[in-house]
Amino acid sequence: SLGGENSNFVNANGLHDDNHYTCARDMALIGREIWRYPEFLKICQEQSYTIPASDTTEEHVFPQHHKMLIKENKNYYQYAVAGKTGYTSNALSTLITMADNGNMKLVCVVLRTHGANIYPDTKNLFEYVFNNFQKIPVADEKKPTEVKEFITASDESENAGSAQTGGNEYQPLEDGYVILPKDVSYKDVDYEITDVDEKTGEGTIQYTYDGHSVGSATAKFTEKYLQKISTGKECVDNSGTTKNSGGKSSAKS
């Protein structure tokens, strides 16, 4: 499950139906999955696709419609790597775009916008995040005392091998970092340990800043911490979440 909560799809063509709806967050969650499939990203960047003529049909050429991916277009955006356009008279213009500036990968969703505004709105949103937020790898910072080592997405991929889904290489989503405003320090981030597997000694660390989720990391925990869990010195609920001081690890990162 991707975690969407406000969508219901009743057709595959996207045409209007009162029972066919979604929201920006759910579309962003769907768009985030594209990062898992490099082959799909490659397809999205094609400038056109041609279906050759046959005995029964003429040649059909399908051009790229996402203007941020067309170098000759005034709306071209150098960091855009994939996306999908949409329009109905009821929904107006919609646009989902994926961008990568070499440091941060983002998904932007713009809904119910008039066509002339959809590309500049998307670019402005991307530029705001790229210019005002920072991506901090947690492995480069001081580890929480409970953590033995962090497990990166590349580690998971090497251990599991390259899974194949529908003929496309599948890659785990990158984690192990936090996204913070540039004027905020990593030491101001709080964390909570969840989903601990006592057999493997692995689990997830959820990071928050000012009550907002800012990232997560997969980690292998110390024997001392695992012993605390098994002996009940740390209160852990059925989901494997450490509950301290009101349900949250009180220590700063």
Residue ranges of model-derived segments:
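Domain-terminus/edge residues, biased toward the C-terminal soluble/receptor-binding domains
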Residues: G4, N8, N13-S253
